[in-house]
Amino acid sequence: YSESEEIYLKIVDYIFEQLDNDLAYTKKVYKYMLKGDIINGTQICKLLLEQDIIDIDEEEEQRFLNGSITAYAFMMNRIQNLDITPAQLALDPHSASMVITDVNTGDVLALVSYPGYDNNKMANGVDAEYFNSLLNDQSTPMINYATRQMTAPGSTFKMVSATAGLMEGIITPRSTLFCNGLFDKITPPASCLGRHGSLNVTEAINHSCNMFFYEVGYELGTEGESYSSELGLEKIRNYADLYGLTETTGIEIEESAPTVSTEDAVRSAIGQGTNNFSTVGLARYVTTIANNGTCYNLTLVDKITDRSGIVLTDNHASVRNTINMDSSYWDAIQQGMRKVIESKSYYNDLGVKVAGKTGTAEENKNRGNHALFVCYAPYEQPEIAVATRIAYGYTSTYAARMTKEVLKYYFDLAEEDEVITGTASQIT
């Protein structure tokens, strides 16, 4: 048998071996050292310089070293100039995704996930050291956030509920419901962010009135005098299915399967409950709205060629289903989305009319809300649809502003260097 001291030493060796590979523990050590004034911010900044983690001009480096720039200002400059990226910080928010589709064909024009990695180091033999660094990266760059990350859709889901309400005869384009800020037909009551008074479905989408859609969710589950959440959920699922939100989108790479809510029809009608969708799933959904009801199985593949470039197969997205809905219903929903954008002053100078819907979704009370935005443009004759998500991005305004920059570039309203400036647009 081993002696107790020998066992103790082996346990200690094992613990130290594990701690050497525990990035979370290492971060806690640094945090303890900073809070205990064992090291200070200036020393941390000097480490970044000495280890060549950042590259800055000599003038700023000298100003920092001689004390003309504080450590705080130095770090803010690094973040502002993207010398240190959100992915490197791995603080919220550090990831985002965007999907752009051709609304008339179902082709995926762009599918972007941040952070990413260098494909060149993963081809023709994997760089083992680089691959290991990706596996241990706290920003998880190997996850395709556009296809694999699932979050609640927030208020971007309200067009599904609007469709359900209209097609089930609960509401008409002109009928109104009254919002007093509290829906008390269920226990516990559900609240609205405002007291909107009487509004129709177009105004409810514009103002993102929870109360309006709570009532729709409740009525979907009501037969006679009896309310059944299960019945309401079944109907919500049926209309979510019309927009392709019950299954994967058809793209030729792996994606996570969506979830349509299975609890609380009233709250599910505003995008809460257990609703969970990918960014590419939301892109297919808004594509279907933009083209008045054609739901495509999306595709990433344009054509297949042989080695010499001869086309073997021309590929086209297939139509999954169509939504046969009265044109006045489409008008009511789309006008609501247009009014959403008209209320955003930062879209006034874009030069192309856009229809869209913002959404925020809480997943963790200790972290920021997910920021979501879906849209299509031009409003009168749609060409593209866009879905954007910034995980733990706090406010949907950030997702909407980021999308605006992409729209400017797509519609030739700005040059690439005007959109990609190499600096952060805002630090808060």
Please provide the spans of the model-predicted regions:
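Short, gly/Ser/Thr-rich active-site loops of penicillin-recognizing serine hydrolases
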Residues: 311-312, 316-318, 404-428
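Amphipathic oligomerization regions
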Residues: 391-410
